[in-house]
Amino acid sequence: PERVNETEGRDRIRALDADAWVVIAFGQKLGRRLLEDRFAINLHASLLPRWRGAAPINAAMVAGDTETGNSVITLAEEMDAGLVLGQSRRAIEPRYTAGELHDLLAEDGPELMLRVLGQHVGGTLEAEAQDESRVTLASKMSKADGWIDFAQSAEACRARVHGLTPWPGVGIELGDTMLKLRRVAAEAGHGSAKPGAVLDADGLIACGEGALRLLEVQPAGKKPMAFSAFANGREIAIGSIARSERPPC
């Protein structure tokens, strides 16, 4: 049903008389009247109570977390606040983008869900309340989040770029060209140049600590490409400043 909490949608679902309701990436909140006397569970892409909300994968990566995973929880009135029935863990490798991590967690999810359902059927399922003192929130991302602050460390910049790829993406102005940064690497050292300064013609940008190597970019209106392909035939001005504006609040 398009609107599950209205009378028609609610009646259609309850008429199924299912033993268990499984919710995965569903854009509507199931109301209390719909959930009464039902075993209803949800798969959420974080290690709850860390990163409740709409964008847990992006939030974990931008924050520099080194590990995330999936949680199966009971559905509750408050978003993502149900009892934790099971979790699976996965390391966040520096090379991952949010899109790649999403796909890996999507592969892990069914196994975790089946394990929880099996424990439910077998009567061995245990539930654990979330520690409210450890709750962090993952707000929905928008195009306005697509900025970067080169005054931060190179590692923080890498985490932000990969955590916002493929969407909304991080945009910079390099010379007279607008670029989306698709894949980067953090490098140590490189002196004390002004953050945002172009350090070499191969896409090295100074940060507050270390420097960011541009590996894959997407010029406006074009497909993603290696930075070397973008730079081929262009004059990359050493010492020029790459800019990225954070929209006003």
Segments predicted by a language model, with ranges:
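C-terminal active-site/capping subdomain that shapes the small-molecule cofactor and substrate pocket
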Residues: R158-C249
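One-carbon transfer enzymes
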Residues: P1-P166, G210-R213, P219-G221, I238-C249
